[in-house]
């Protein structure tokens, strides 16, 4: 049984916990502790009730300073200094770093100082982390000696499996991406101050361009794609689910049926459970609470001049990513166990 702690119990932290109980991985992973500055009653309430994902199927109670979910008792901490957390005493195998404030490797090593064996970061990190993983594409690179690992971003997890499939079958020459991302909690409900002037504006009233490093994230996972992609991102007035509009120039000549067939086979085969495929006339809310990293919308596939391909991909940017955090954590432990067996 893997003993884990969650540092930062916001959208991703809570999704990780709920996904664990819904995914069937509860027999492999135990959440021992949560570190979150919010008040315990707010933690309990937002675990039980969620505007996006609905009411949690488990009963959640507070007893003697612990969060009780069924028969599980989870210790709660409210510590701003991660070096003061009792991860060693609690024998924590992996910390899910989901606070959004500990981004660089050096900052995340505070958990190692506190006694945790490994850290899995829920966002892109600095180049000096031991590995940046998109589960299903490069998790085989995990090694026993890796202590600080990044799970990349939700959009990187969405697009990289598709690029990997296209490149292996047809050769990718270049690409341009537009991420159509739901609003996030770094935006404003009504106009208010922010360092990014566009994010000073009300999230529910505008389509808002924001910076993205998605193209660089693709390169980190697929080095062959270096300098081949550029990306822009806009935030839209929805609270969950993201679409990615991707245009790719391929080496080989293709048509719509060939592209869709290859992606459908990948979804049934190597990327089963990670990549999805649909030819139904669906909209964004239909992908809410979808555990897969990416779903190809086959109705939107277009091909121009045999080489320029346009695709539309969907993902639940919270739930899909939370499920990959669980998958990557198990892969980290398997890598560690493989060395000990040798």
UniProtKB/Swiss-Prot annotation:
GO BP term, example: pyridoxal phosphate biosynthetic process
Pfam families: Gp_dh_C (PF02800), Gp_dh_N (PF00044)
InterPro entries the record matches: E4P_DH_bac (IPR006422), GlycerAld/Erythrose_P_DH (IPR020831), GlycerAld_3-P_DH_AS (IPR020830), GlycerAld_3-P_DH_cat (IPR020829), GlycerAld_3-P_DH_NAD(P)-bd (IPR020828), NAD(P)-bd_dom_sf (IPR036291)
Catalysed reaction, written as an equation: D-erythrose 4-phosphate + NAD(+) + H2O = 4-phospho-D-erythronate + NADH + 2 H(+)
Record key words, sorted: Cytoplasm, NAD, Oxidoreductase, Pyridoxine biosynthesis
GO CC annotations on file: cytoplasm
Any one Gene Ontology molecular-function term assigned to this protein's record: NAD binding
Binding-site residues for substrate, renumbered to this chain: 153-155, 199, 212-213, 235
UniProt site positions, description: Activates thiol group during catalysis: 181
Predominant cellular place of this UniProt entry's protein: cytoplasm
Assembly and oligomerization: Homotetramer.
Protein name listed in UniProt: D-erythrose-4-phosphate dehydrogenase
Organism: Shewanella denitrificans (strain OS217 / ATCC BAA-1090 / DSM 15013)
Record lineage: Bacteria, Pseudomonadati, Pseudomonadota, Gammaproteobacteria, Alteromonadales
Gene, per the UniProt record: epd
């Amino acid at each position: 049984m893997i003993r884990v702690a969650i540092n930062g119990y916001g959208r991703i932290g809570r999704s990780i916990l709920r996904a664990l109980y819904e995914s069937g991985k509860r027999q492999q992973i135990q959440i021992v502790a949560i570190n979150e500055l919010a008040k315990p009653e707010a933690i309990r309430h937002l675990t039980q009730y969620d505007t996006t994902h609905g009411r949690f199927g488990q009963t959640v109670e507070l007893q003697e300073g612990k969060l009780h979910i069924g028969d599980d008792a989870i210790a709660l901490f409210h510590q701003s200094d991660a070096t003061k957390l009792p991860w060693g005493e609690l024998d924590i195998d992996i910390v899910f770093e989901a606070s959004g404030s500990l981004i660089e490797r050096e900052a995340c090593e505070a958990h190692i100082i506190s006694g945790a064996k490994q850290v899995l970061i829920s966002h892109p990190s600095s180049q000096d982390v031991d590995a940046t993983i998109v589960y299903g594409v490069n998790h085989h690179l995990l090694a026993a000696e890796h202590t600080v690992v990044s799970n990349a971003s939700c959009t990187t997890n969405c697009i990289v499996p598709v690029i990997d499939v296209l490149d292996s079958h047809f050769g990718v020459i270049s690409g341009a991406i537009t991420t159509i991302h739901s609003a996030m909690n770094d935006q404003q409900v009504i106009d208010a101050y922010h360092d990014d002037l566009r994010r000073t504006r009300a999230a529910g009233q505008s389509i808002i361009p924001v910076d993205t490093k998605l193209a660089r994230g693709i390169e980190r996972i697929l080095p062959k794609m270096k300098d081949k992609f550029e990306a822009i991102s806009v935030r839209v007035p929805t609270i969950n689910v993201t679409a990615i509009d991707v245009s790719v120039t391929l080496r080989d000549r293709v048509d719509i049926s060939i592209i869709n067939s290859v992606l459908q086979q990948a979804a049934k085969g190597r990327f089963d459970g990670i990549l999805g495929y649909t030819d139904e006339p669906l909209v964004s809310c239909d992908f809410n609470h979808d555990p897969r990293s990416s779903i190809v919308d086959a109705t939107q596939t277009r091909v121009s001049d045999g080489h320029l391909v346009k695709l539309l991909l969907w993902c639940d940017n919270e739930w899909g990513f939370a499920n990959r955090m669980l998958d990557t954590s198990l892969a980290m432990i398997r890598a560690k166990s493989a060395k000990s067996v040798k």
